[in-house]
Amino acid sequence: MRTLRILAVGRIRTPFWQQAATHYMERIRHNCRLTETVVKDGGAALPPTARNADEGARLIAAMGPTDIVVCLDEHGRNMTSRDFAGFIERLTENATRTPCFVIGGAFGLDKSVLQRAEHKLALGPMTFPHEMARVVLLEQLYRADAILRGAPYHHD
């Protein structure tokens, strides 16, 4: 069974994104061990740079020594769903390390977090709200698992 981790800034507040995230987390957990760690948002009164630094420090503190840090970033690598499935398969070959997908807050990820990344992944060329990005990531993790299992979820 694959082990995956999501490390994100802030809880999902919008009800329909909460429902979608719960839906995919429940589906993923039938075949994968998935944990989610949520760190507190930076202070809303802080300027974006200070807020990112604050959130970045929390994210780094929550990272484990065996995490394979994969940051979601608009400048990251774009992949097809099949490529992403292969990427997940390669990352989970070593059972002593855990892929940890890191999602920033409203202003993205601090450079200190991006410097810790072993991989940077883009969900596409467009920018998404961080709540939506979390749901898209969850769906793609579920899809990748279905592809790797040969389940009839993904259609080319």
UniProtKB/Swiss-Prot annotation:
Residues passing through the membrane, by range: none
EC numbers for this chain: 2.1.1.177
Gene Ontology terms: cellular component: cytoplasm
Disulfide links within the chain: none
Leading EC class: transferase
Residues annotated as binding S-adenosyl-L-methionine: L72, G104, L123, G124, P125, M126, T127, F128
Reactions catalysed according to its record: pseudouridine(1915) in 23S rRNA + S-adenosyl-L-methionine = N(3)-methylpseudouridine(1915) in 23S rRNA + S-adenosyl-L-homocysteine + H(+)
UniProt-annotated location(s): Cytoplasm
Key words, A-Z: Cytoplasm, Methyltransferase, rRNA processing, S-adenosyl-L-methionine, Transferase
Signal sequence, start to end: none
PANTHER family linked: METHYLTRANSFERASE (PTHR33603), RIBOSOMAL RNA LARGE SUBUNIT METHYLTRANSFERASE H (PTHR33603:SF1)
Assembly and oligomerization: Homodimer.
Entry similarity comment: Belongs to the RNA methyltransferase RlmH family.
Function: Specifically methylates the pseudouridine at position 1915 (m3Psi1915) in 23S rRNA.
Protein name: Ribosomal RNA large subunit methyltransferase H
Organism: Nitratidesulfovibrio vulgaris (strain ATCC 29579 / DSM 644 / CCUG 34227 / NCIMB 8303 / VKM B-1760 / Hildenborough)
